[in-house]
Structure formats: C-alpha cells, structure tokens
Amino acid sequence: DIVTSGRWTKEQLKLAFHLYCQLPFGRLHSRNPEIIKLATLIGRTPSAIAMKLVNFASLDPAIVTSGRSGLGNASSLDKEVWKEFHADWEKLAIECAQLRQGLERGYESETMADAIGDDLALEDFTGETKQVLTAQRVKQQFFRRAVLSSYRGRCCMSGLSEPRLLIASHIVPWSKDKTNRLNPSNGLCLSAIHDRAFDQGLIALTDDFRI
C-alpha cells in the first residue's frame, strides 16, 4: 500500500525522489505546496517529506560539491532508489507518473496501467500518439522541470529568468544518448536564443563547462 505512515515504502521513496528532482534545494521545506500535496497523497507529514528530500540531497553530487549538504542519514533503500533512477530515468519517470495519477484519482497504483491504457506506455520519443496524456509529454515535462530547478529557473549563460523564454536543452543530444535523455545532469537551462545558438554549434562548452 502506497498510503502509509509506517516505514517508508519503495513506491513512496520513488515519488519523493521524483519530486526532489523537480525542486531547487532552497524549496525543500515543509511549507512548499508541492511537498504538502505529496504528503497528503501518501499519508506522510510535510515535515517527513521535506526531511526525506534533504536526505536525497546528501546523495547528490551537485549539492555536495557546491558546499551544501543534506541530512546525511540516507537509508539503504534511499540509495537503492537513487541508483535505480540513474540507471533508467525514462522508466522511473513514467512509473512515478503512473503512481501519482493513481493516487490523485483515488485508485491503487496497480490499477493505473489499465486506467490509463497505452497513454503512459514506455515508448521511444519517436513514437507518435494523439492521446492527451502521453509518455512523451510526461518525459518532457519531467526533464524540463528537473533542469530548470537545477539552475534555479535561470538561463545558465545570460541569467534570464522568464520561464516562457527558458528551454531545457540537452548537452548530449537525446538522439545520441538514450540512457541519459531524462538525466537532469545532461541538461542546461538556456534562453531560447542561447539554446538555438548551442544547437547550431555557435556556442560550445568545454568539459569543465566553460563557454
């Protein structure tokens, strides 16, 4: 059962990490509306969710190398979920979307595959579908939110912070690296013009991310 206040289940941890990827470090607190919503869905307190997200932060090289730190007491199951996500971002992004949809509709997660049908089937970005809720859209939205949160909603080259003009750009093109298509560390938050320049090879990055 996903909804439980006992020991953390793997499904709860997946949903927590899924949310962690989409929030900047400064918003990992119990007053965050998104944390409150997840807490309500899975039967946890907002404080418990916030603490778990900060536990995940202790495993995040991007956080640790910046001089910040999490709580440092991540469990073995926390680490297992972390590794699973990094091994298959697409699969876990879809699975978490299914879990969230199931909880939000009041169904058990096991029934979601039938409720949604093929709309969230694991498929390539090349697969075309006319359904409103598609795997492609789920993946794209996850990657965009994860990348923008990593860069605190600002273009990493110009500092522009207007969301409507920001693009989550892939460092290694998605067509060339299927494994890391949804990996936030393979993304740059760029303004539309910088994204276009980067895509056309007018701007390049060195291995240490110098322009």
Task: List PLM regions with ranges.
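Major-groove recognition helix of helix-turn-helix-like DNA-binding domains
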Residues: 44-59
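Short, charged surface segments at domain edges that flank catalytic/cofactor-binding sites
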Residues: 115-160, 172-185
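Short Lys/Arg-enriched helix C-cap and helix-to-coil transition segments
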Residues: 61-81
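Short alpha-helical "recognition helix" segments of helix-turn-helix
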Residues: 34-39
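Short, Lys/Arg-enriched anionic-surface-contact patches
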Residues: 2-22, 134
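Short helix->loop/beta-hairpin flanking segments within DNA-binding domains
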Residues: 20-30
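Hydrophobic alpha-helical segments and helix pairs
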Residues: 82-125
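Histidine-centered nuclease catalytic patch
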Residues: 157-188, 199-211
